[in-house]
Amino acid sequence: MASTAHRQPSRPTTRQRQRTGRACEECRRRKLRCDGQQPRCGVCVDSGVTCEVNSQRRPRGPKKGYLTALRNRVAMLETRLPAQHLVGPLSEFNPLSTPLTNDHHDGCSVSSASSRSDSNPPPTVSEPDMSLPNTTTSVSSAPSFATCSKDIGGAEPITELVQAELNQLYFDRVHPSIQILHQRRYLGWARNAAKKTSRRCLQYAVWTLASLLSAQFQHLQDSFYQETKRTLEFSYLSGDSNAPVDTEEIQAWILIATYESMRTFHRSAWMSAGRAFRLVQLMRLHEIDSPTKPPVPEADLVETEEKRRVFWMAYFLDHLLSMRNNWPITLNEHVICTRLPAPDMEFQSGQPVLGAFLSEAIMDVMPQTTSPFNECVILATICGRSLFHAQQYSVRFVYGELAPNWTDQHQWLDNVLTNRLQILSQYYPSPTQICDPMLSFAHIMGQASVIHLYKGMASVVWAVDDGAWVVEYQRRALSAAQEIVKLAKGLTEFNFFKVCHTASLPCND
């Protein structure tokens, strides 16, 4: 009795919250709280056993990422359940619904993608495999996507709440840099279960970029990306070659090219952008405002403005890629009869604001409306002209047809660029004062244009008689490089998601 009374303080009636640390083996076996006293805990003293603590025991609980993968798998099964009743026996013939056994191609199962994201993150520097999944079903006999439910190939294991979050993430973090979607118009048809293939592709492209820029949904990006590419390719192979092209298909290719560039899949980004350029030409978006066309009805103003934005974004990407790689430009400015896009605020609110033509905007020293994206387009045009002049001069030199006015052309471009830099400083706020991704990129683009003009001159320096002129351009190029470094340091003060995502396409090497 005395010994029991003596040991009672070590076992209080009201136990406190278990201390941090490991319990002994006896307490674990009996599922009791261990007080952790040394050399023996209270339970071991009462039991008369040796108190042993195993310091090599693995931590309790499920493995990292297991619960997330389990939730995604449950959500996927919930989504597929109604789809099986809608699709019926056709689902087994869908080439995109067949699960792939190769881990490298397994992008349709989000549950597998989520489990991989916790242990082995996807590579960010290697080129992805763009081949279509192997199938024994011919393209002509495969069912149309229009007959399927909203689950494309079983790769949409997300609830309506997650869809809404991904859509909002896109317009919060992606749209400020790539302003090619009308938010109300997109959300209007995105909620409908029945969508045509091009809109499904665009929706998945939106989710691909949104998940890339999300900490919560990053494990879904590979699945969304693979499904978008496969659906785009399959719709091209199975569709009618004479069928009209939808704007949503071009928008999807532009977003996918941007995603691939951000993931450093540069060759794939170039190929995807090329598809967008050819579709832009096929839709003749370069002549939306041609005087030979009838006036646009008021009900179609938003749709027409969206087409303008798609064209100019494709034009902008074309020039950025050509500038970086010294490639010929695909979308030539001299055949464009499409007005520049209206400011995004007016576009989203549906106000009919008519932009200027490119040739007018380049020479306008007192712009009536301000748009950072339009400034980027104008600066890209100046660089494109410099690139074209340098390429043309090199070809003429080979054929012995030297143009005597190269210096005059370069001087004219330099004067136009100087005016645009002054407009940026006078009519727009400083990029350090306002967090606008397109405005920051416009300022960086302006300084990069100075460097690009110098590179164009350096490529044909043998054609320039005045050596002092070359030295002056070199000094200005060095000053522009220092200004870019200064602007880039200022971007570190902003949120990562507020940085312009087209900056992943470098203007210069």
Swiss-Prot record:
InterPro entries attached to this UniProt entry: TF_fung, Transcription_factor_dom_fun, Zn2-C6_fun-type_DNA-bd_sf, Zn2Cys6_DnaBD
SUPFAM superfamilies found in the cross-reference section: Zn2/Cys6 DNA-binding domain
Name under which the protein is recorded: Citrinin biosynthesis transcriptional activator mrl3
Keyword Cell cycle: no
Keywords of this entry: DNA-binding, Metal-binding, Nucleus, Transcription, Transcription regulation, Zinc
PANTHER family: C6 FINGER DOMAIN TRANSCRIPTION FACTOR DBAA-RELATED (PTHR47338:SF3), ZN(II)2CYS6 TRANSCRIPTION FACTOR (EUROFUNG)-RELATED (PTHR47338)
Region span, Disordered: 1-22, 97-143
Subcellular location: Nucleus
BP-aspect Gene Ontology terms: DNA-templated transcription
Entry's induction text: Expression is stimulated under green light conditions.
Record-annotated DNA-binding residue ranges: 24-51
Primary site of residence: nucleus
Annotated function: Transcription factor that regulates the expression of the gene cluster that mediates the biosynthesis of the mycotoxin citrinin, a hepato-nephrotoxic compound to humans due to inhibition of respiration complex III.
Sequence ranges of Low complexity compositional bias: 109-119
Listed GO MF terms: DNA binding; DNA-binding transcription factor activity, RNA polymerase II-specific; zinc ion binding
Pfam families in the record: Fungal_trans, Zn_clus
Organism domain of life: Eukaryota
CDD domains: fungal_TF_MHR, GAL4
GO cellular component terms listed in the entry, alphabetical order: nucleus
Biased composition annotated in UniProt, kind: Polar residues: 132-143
